[in-house]
């Protein structure tokens, strides 16, 4: 089952990206280095639940 999750910047706290993840195959939370437009650099983004 795919669920919609957000990716929140660890440095500024903004949710910059949303994506889907398969909760059966990926049980741990996502951690990706993505571009933060507010800080204008690549930072660590962690998974958060989105209100649906």
UniProtKB/Swiss-Prot annotation:
The family this protein is said to belong to: Belongs to the bacterial ribosomal protein bL33 family.
Keyword Ribonucleoprotein applies: yes
Organism of provenance: Campylobacter jejuni subsp. jejuni serotype O:2 (strain ATCC 700819 / NCTC 11168)
Gene Ontology MF term list: structural constituent of ribosome
Pfam families: Ribosomal_L33
Keywords: Ribonucleoprotein, Ribosomal protein
The name this protein goes by in its record: Large ribosomal subunit protein bL33
HAMAP family listed in its UniProt record: Ribosomal_bL33
InterPro entries listed in its UniProt record: Ribosomal_bL33 (IPR001705), Ribosomal_bL33_CS (IPR018264), Ribosomal_bL33_sf (IPR038584), Ribosomal_zn-bd (IPR011332)
Cellular component, GO annotation: cytoplasm; ribonucleoprotein complex; ribosome
A GO BP entry: translation
PROSITE patterns xref list: RIBOSOMAL_L33
């Amino acid at each position: 089952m795919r669920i919609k999750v957000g990716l929140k910047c660890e440095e500024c706290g903004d949710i910059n990206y949303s994506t889907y993840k398969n909760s059966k195959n990926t049980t741990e939370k996502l951690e990706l280095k993505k571009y933060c437009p507010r800080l204008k650099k690549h930072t660590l983004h962690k998974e958060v639940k989105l209100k649906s």
